[in-house]
Amino acid sequence: MTTNDWITKLEAKMFDADIEAAIRSAYDCMAKNGGIYEKTEQACAASEQTLSGMLSKEQTDKIARYRQCAAAQMDCVSKYGFTAGLVNAIFCYRDTANKIPVNEETLIEQQISVDQSVEVRAAVKALTDECLTIDAGLQQELPGDLYEHVVSITCAWDERIHFSGIYGYYLGYRTALSMLRTLFPTASVIMEPLTLILEHHMGLNKTFEESEGKAHSK
């Protein structure tokens, strides 16, 4: 086995089925008990139930194909996000340690953008184009009240895809941070502001003001 073979094998092990399951589980946790995706998922489930039995076989097959393409997009962006987080954490540590300003939120969005990878961009574009074609076809075929339910379903998939990229990035970032601590024990302290901003960006934590506002609204 060559060195490249070992590297390929190692990369496959770093992002395996367990990581994919962890991303799905994290999303599911945020889609219930008042999580930020709860309303979107509730609307999606209600719309799927409403459409059940009301569509032709061809239309049902189109929605099934939409799900397949969207799920494949999730797979692409989560793996890419993991790699981006892994690499970006190292550069962010270097810049932060050297007191070079880092625009964290902009950096996060830029790093998970598949536009930076020709290969990933092409794969995601093909899947996105097919989803858009299916959606446009259903919009033409269905009356407005039924198509609204299709919109609820596609919105949920959009949220899942975006979260997969962000959470994949977060897992890669945390993996790199763990490695950095082995060499630089103060890495966690140096990177704490960026870590908190990243977690807030993902909806994993709230500012004190946000927590107070939520408590006051109850």
Each predicted region: which residue ranges?
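Intrinsic-disorder/low-complexity detector
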Residues: 1-218
